Every structure is written in structure tokens, then in C-alpha cells.
Amino acid sequence: MDLLRILDTKPIPTIVDATTLGISGNTSGDYWLPTTMSLYQKELTDQIVSLHYSDILRYFETSHYKEDVILESMKTMCLNGSLVATHPYLLIDHYMPKSLITRDVPAHLAENSGKFSVLRDLINLVQEYETETAIVCRPGRTMDLLEALLLGNKVHIKRYDGHSIKSKQKANDFSCTVHLFSSEGINFTKYPIKSKARFDMLICLDTTVDTSQKDIQYLLQYKRERKGLERYAPIVRLVAINSIDHCRLFFGKKFDKNSREYLENVTAAMVILRDRLGTLPPDLRPIYSQKLHYLVEWLENPTVPWPLPDIYPLKQYTSMDVERSLLTEVHFKKSDDQLEDAFSNCSKKRGRHGANKAASSTVAGIEDNITPSFYSTKRLKNDYYTNPLKQDMTQLTGITTADNSSNVNYHLSSGIITHKLIQSMGEVYMDICVQKQELDDYSCLDDLQNDHLKFFSNEDEKIIKEYETVLRTNNENLNRSHELEVENNLKFSQIETLEKDIETLKGSLMAQGETLSKLKDAFVKTDNVQDEIEKEERVSVSRDTEKKYMEQEIKRAVDAIRENEEETHKLNEKQNGLESELKLKFEKSEISTKELNEKIGFLKKELKLENDLNEELVGQLSKTMDNLENLTIPRVRTQNGNTKKKSRAKKPGNV
């Protein structure tokens, strides 16, 4: 047994009990598992905030910005921060491996993301059981990285988006199956679930998973009973502590996710908490150093309470807090645990560190100290090899006679001016100009502020007077109520005494004999008869009113009947007039029809005569044409040549 090796190894911290952790006994089925963040993730988050520095200030300090531009910038910052909180390769792909199926990729992915490291430890525990685990995350590259991480575990992977980084899946006999679903656009018709058993756990990798959606509810209730404690699969949300995911998860329960308050609180918390990204509380660190073995009992029986505390609450920060945080430079260390740093810097064997032992024990303290520049340690203090006595240039040259008692005005008294001194002088002068301008602005606004002060002082006095008036009225009301209460008590006591007197009088009357008892019965009967009379009078009054109402209704009905009869008579008269008009028009139309028929007969006769005449003329024309065809035409002989000569000879004589 190598005792030296055992003593040199890092001691395993003990896990504190549940009471110290602040466990609330949560059995809701929706749990959060905080994760750490790598140094690369922290630096990227700080750079994202720095890139949006001006937009953040404009968003929190002013109200006249372009809403679409600034709001889109804030949403882009939150989206990029959420991507980095999951894995830095989702935003920066410079160091992205060319192939995601090589053997060293899972360890490399877990090293650069605290969330992937915790997920790997959780899957290492789950793979020891015969379980069906569902993981939901963003579609695209997130699922590719998640599949590449799971290739390093002994699990069977089933992906439901139609893609895979591995073209061929080898057959294996792993007992644990991990199902990968995208948080957007799950199509169970195209990609049905390939599991005959229910899901034992649903892991949400990022904040895009909405467990109230219909598809996610289907996964939670898949193959489960509709009633009972186990009708839903337990949900485990992996959330990087103090990151944008933590802010969204916490403030999403307090505000509407589309409201301005939600965006303001999430953005402010992201900016202010960037120096505490992924920093686990000391009570939780032993759980993660032991690879989450603390959760084995819950994994075996998910019905027991969640063994970790609920989500840590966050403050609602103001714009002043955001501005102060933006002016503060953030420094990150590789590890927040000094014991972890000490053991990582020491060698595994005792004989190897030797003289560096003292230096290695103070590594954490050295990292916190910022190394001063050359100008602040040497030249500005006159500490260089040509000036062993550390005398200033005034004493060495005798040229300048300025007062050198203060180190602040060194650049005014020394004979040496460096580039850094010139730059610092320029910055100081610029700051002085800005301060002078601000002072002038404040001087200009002094009268306005005095007016504001006077106005608010007057308002304050008015409010104080109103308050005093209301207070005085309240006191008077209290006194009056007290007096009324005293009077009521006196009257109550008087009523009690009168009731007692009445009882005594009744007793004395009963003791006097039957006559008084008969009088009492008669008095009671008289009282009852009086009540019945009053009741009958009320009934008669109500009947009279009802009778009047019915008479009015009958009168209205009679008037309505009379009006209807008059309208009916008018309509009958109008109908008779229309019928007579129609008869006259029918008679006129019959007369015109007879005349038209006579004209038509006359025209038909004339048309027949014309047709006969036409036929006769056609017959004559045909005879004439036949005669013309039979007629012989005589032929005339002409001498063409002689005729032409004679005509030519006659021309000169005629001329």
C-alpha cells in the first residue's frame, strides 16, 4: 500500500445532510439540477455582454431609443447567452471537431461545457439500470453535440428528427435507451416512438422546452396510467447556475415571457451575475465532485422527494445596479475551489515538486494579484539601472525647478515624457473637460432643479395638510363612534331593564287570576285579528292595482282592434279600386287586339296579291330570257388592215 500516494490525492469531501442543504421535500415531478460552467463559457458570456454594452445602457437609461433595434439586440444577447450556457460550440465553431464520432470527442465536449459534464455524470448513473430516458433540446447542432456526447456512454441512442451523425448504428445489448427529441416541431406521425415501455425520466437540456405543450405532455404520459402519483414522468431541468437559463427559469414563473418586465429582469440579472457564472454553493460541491452519486436513491425510486434544494431565488436589479456592473471588470479563474487548484498544481508524487512546494501553495493568491506594468514599477519611480540612487531628473540635470513633492504631478516635473504618460495626460484632460461640461450643465439646470424643489416642497406641504385634515377627521370619527357606542350600551341596558319589568308585570298579571288571563288572551286575539286585517288590506290593494292594470291592457287591446279594422277597410277599398282599373285595362287590351287582328288579315291579303304579282312577273321574265336565248345575232365582217390605212391617210388632209 502506497501511503504517500494516498496522502497526496485529493480528499473526498463529505456531503452535508438534507437539513443543511435546505431541501424542501419537493415531489411535484418538475425538478432543477444546477450545473457549473467552464472557463470558456464564462469568458464568452462576458464578451457577449461587452458587445452589447451600448445597447444595454440605452435600454436601461433612456426611453427614446428605437424600440425594434434595441429590443432585438437584447433578445439576441439573451439567445447567444443561452446557447453558450448549453455549449460554447453552438455559438463559436472555431474549435468544433471536424468529426463528431471519434473516440475523444465526448470527453472534449464535456470538458468545455459544465452542463454536458453534469449530463454525462447523470447518464453514467442511469446506464446501470434498464431504463428509457428521454432528452429534449434545441433542434439542429444541439442534438448533434448531444448525440456525440452520448456515444461515449453505454446507451442505445434513438433520435427522432430524421438525422444522425452516425450513418450506421451497430447492434448493441445495452440495457439503457436514450431517446432524443427536439423542442420544436416533433412529428410523431413521421417518426413514431420506438419504445414499448414508458419513459422513466425526461431531461430538459435548455430553456426552449415548454412542458405545457401537447407533444411534451404526450411524452410525459406515454404508456402511463391516467391517474395516480406516477401518471407523469419526472422532469429534470439542467440549468447552469446564475446563467441566463437560471434567470429565465426563475423570472418566467413571476412574469409573462412576452412582457417588458420579464426582459428587463432577465437582462439585468444576466449582466450583474456574470461574475458568478456557474459558481455552486459550497454545500453542493461535494455532490458534483462525487459524480452525482448522491442522486442514486432518487433514481431508483423517483417518488421520493427531490434530494436537492429548489431553484435559488434571484433579486430584481435596478438600472443603477446594471450600470455599476458594466463599469466593473470581471476576472475569472479556472476553478473556484482553492483545494482543487492546490491539488491540480501539485504533482501526484511527493518527490517531484521539491523547491516549488512553497510556490504552489500560494497559486490562488498570486492569480488574484494583477501584475503591475513596467512604467508603474520602474520608470515612474526612477528605479532603473542608470539611476541607482533613484534621483529624479530635476536633481540629476538641474534644469526643471518644479515642485516634485507629489507623485501625482510627476509628468509635469520630470524631464521624461513617455507615450504612456502622454496617453494618461490626454485621458486626464478629457476627463477634466467632461467633468467641467457636466458642472456647467448642472449649473444651467440649477434653477430648474430649484423650481422642482420648490414645487415638490409645496406639494409636500399640501400633502401634509391634507394628511393632518384626514387625521383630524379620523380622530373625530373615532370619538363620535366611541360616544355612539356608549349611548348604545346605555340603551341596551335600558332595554334589558324594561324587558325585566315586562316579565315581572306579566308574572303579576298571571298571578291575579282567570280574568286577567282572559284579558290577555283577548288582547292576543285582537292583535292577531289586526295583523290579518292589515294583511287583507294589502291583498286588496294589490288586487286593485292589478285590476287597474288589466283595465288599461283591455283598453289598449280594444284600441288596437279598432285600428286594425280601419286599416282593413282602407285596404279593401284600395283593393276594389285596383280591381276596377284592371278590368278597364283588360277591356282596352281586347279592343286593341281586335284592331290588330283586322290589320294583320288585311296585310296578309295584300301580301298574297303581291306574291301572285311577283310570280306572274317571274314567269314573264323567264319567257323573255328564253326568247333572248333563241334570238340569232348577225355577224359583221371587217378588214383590219384597210381600215387602218384609210384612217392614216385621212389625217394629213384633215390637218
From Swiss-Prot:
Entry superkingdom: Eukaryota
Pfam family, one: HDA2-3
Record bears the keyword Coiled coil: yes
Keyword Cell wall biogenesis/degradation attached: no
Gene3D superfamilies: 3.40.50.12360
Cross-referenced InterPro entries: HDA1_su2/3_sf (IPR038609), Hda2/3 (IPR021006), HDA3 (IPR026216)
Annotated Gene Ontology cellular component terms: cytosol; HDA1 complex; nucleus
Coiled coil: 482-632
Keywords: Chromatin regulator, Coiled coil, Nucleus, Repressor, Transcription, Transcription regulation
GO molecular function: chromatin binding; DNA binding; nucleosome array spacer activity
UniProt miscellaneous comment: Present with 1100 molecules/cell in log phase SD medium.
Stated role: Required for activity of HDA1 histone deacetylase complex. The HDA1 histone deacetylase complex is responsible for the deacetylation of lysine residues on the N-terminal part of the core histones (H2A, H2B, H3 and H4). Histone deacetylation gives a tag for epigenetic repression and plays an important role in transcriptional regulation, cell cycle progression and developmental events.
Subunit structure: Heterodimer with HDA2. Component of the HDA1 histone deacetylase complex composed of at least one HDA1 homodimer and one HDA2/HDA3 heterodimer. Interacts with HDA1 and HDA3.
Family: Belongs to the HDA2/3 family. HDA3 subfamily.
Record protein name field: HDA1 complex subunit 3
Organism name: Saccharomyces cerevisiae (strain ATCC 204508 / S288c) (Baker's yeast)
Highest classification ranks of the organism: Eukaryota, Fungi, Dikarya, Ascomycota, Saccharomycotina
